[in-house]
Amino acid sequence: MELLTGAGLWSVAIFTVIFILLVDLMHRHQHWTSRCPPGPVPWPVLGNLLQVDLGNMPYSLYKLQNRYGDVFSLQMGWKPMVVINGLKAMKEVLLTCGEDTADRPQVPIFEYLGVKPGSQGVVLAPYGPEWQEQRRFSVSTLRNFGLGKKSLEDWVTKEARHLCDAFTAQAGQSINPNTMLNNAVCNVIASLIFARRFEYEDPYLIRMLKMLKECFTEISGFIPGVLNEFPIFLRIPGLADMVFQGQKSFMAILDNLLTENRTTWDPDQPPRNLTDAFLAEIEKAKGNPESSFNDENLRMVVGDLFTAGMVTTSTTLSWALLLMILHPDVQRRVQQEIDAVIGQVQHPEMADQARMPYTNAVIHEVQRFGDIAPLPLPRITSRDIEVQDFLVTKGSTLIPNMSSVLKDETVWEKPLRFHPEHFLDAQGHFVKPEAFMPFSAGHRSCLGEALARMELFLFFTCLLQRFSISVPDGQPQPSNYRVHAIPVAPFPYQLCAVMREQGH
């Protein structure tokens, strides 16, 4: 007992501090060489956690980029990270070294939520045979699946009409468009996965969207960041269950939908939806322990498609309508092109896009300016690589700062302003600079890119074909400030949609 009092206690404390510092130094030394990227000096144990704002990481990285350059190091706890900025460095990492940077690091909060070998879905799965199998299945299904006798475009076009009908019911009123946009995009995903559509007033749909919103809130910000850096806190009884209530509730909703689908699935009939196609693959894979087609992975893949494909598209559409309010001259020019190419009676089709360079440019500029996913999910290096003459060692976590590419001053004429001419040449033809990477690039590019582009074009043109969007009477002009969350959304705003008259 005497050891724990007086000088003995101080000796124990000093020994403990020295031990922690030595362990910390060994962790750093494993990844440090003279050729490593520069970066801020880290604190022992905490690293650079106190030097960045976890609630607004893009701005923190912007300031660090100005100081240290396009490739710099961070130490988050004991995890070495390298942040990649600018088009040139991003191309090196995602394309030139794509095979060596396609892996995912382990994310403790996702492991707690059920991501594990055999049930890792496709978005979070490590780079390897399991990921390749699920990526191939998801991409081919999204591209080629015929839902009954309807193509995917038919489903999106049908939902665009329902969305316009919902706007018509509130024409001339002050409305928040986000709920209706979420409903429409969610129904497209539900049609693809379950061949099912919900009425916008359906309590089941309302609850599902509420839980999905909570999911994104729960995985962003300070607390999840701390849990990822110090996963020992996940062992505190009840803490993780309290933090991730929305995640569990949302997956329970998907489980119910999967159960309903399974009870009506007939393996002798052509698949009605993605779930049927996955169930058929499970049957084929029975007896093959190497296959990633199993019941647990089905729910993870479905969860990936909902979370990755729903809120991102609806948030982009929310930015689109806001920017049309703030730039009425752009809105009028889009409507003129719609009238000239499609007219005011015929429904928009994807085939119209090639003849509508200005509308296409506006949609692309909405994605660039909105910048809704500035920091995609991190990567991890599977071997040593060189980036901009710096050595990035094996096992380093990579943070691709897509915002630095979409707003790269060396590429874009007016990077911080909404300027559709970024995507038009001198003759008014549509052009797409290589710095346009809202869907990322390389092996881990967004698997739902084709579907998202279809939804953005058909929903946007359908709405502007039928309505003029403006600020409601008596309300202030909304701002283009952003809410730094996942995804990055505009501040809540109200709009007034007025039916367009024929010929206007």
From Swiss-Prot:
Reaction catalysis annotation: an organic molecule + reduced [NADPH--hemoprotein reductase] + O2 = an alcohol + oxidized [NADPH--hemoprotein reductase] + H2O + H(+)
Triggers of expression: P450 can be induced to high levels in liver and other tissues by various foreign compounds, including drugs, pesticides, and carcinogens.
A GO molecular-function descriptor: iron ion binding
EC number: 1.14.14.1
Keywords assigned: Endoplasmic reticulum, Heme, Iron, Membrane, Metal-binding, Microsome, Monooxygenase, Oxidoreductase
Positions of heme binding: C446
Class of the enzyme per the UniProt entry, highest EC level: oxidoreductase
GO cellular component, one term: endoplasmic reticulum membrane
Co-factor(s): heme
The UniProt record lists the keyword Membrane: yes
Record's function text: Cytochromes P450 are a group of heme-thiolate monooxygenases. In liver microsomes, this enzyme is involved in an NADPH-dependent electron transport pathway. It oxidizes a variety of structurally unrelated compounds, including steroids, fatty acids, and xenobiotics.
The family this protein is said to belong to: Belongs to the cytochrome P450 family.
Protein name: Cytochrome P450 2D11
Protein's organism: Mus musculus (Mouse)
Gene name, Swiss-Prot/TrEMBL: Cyp2d11
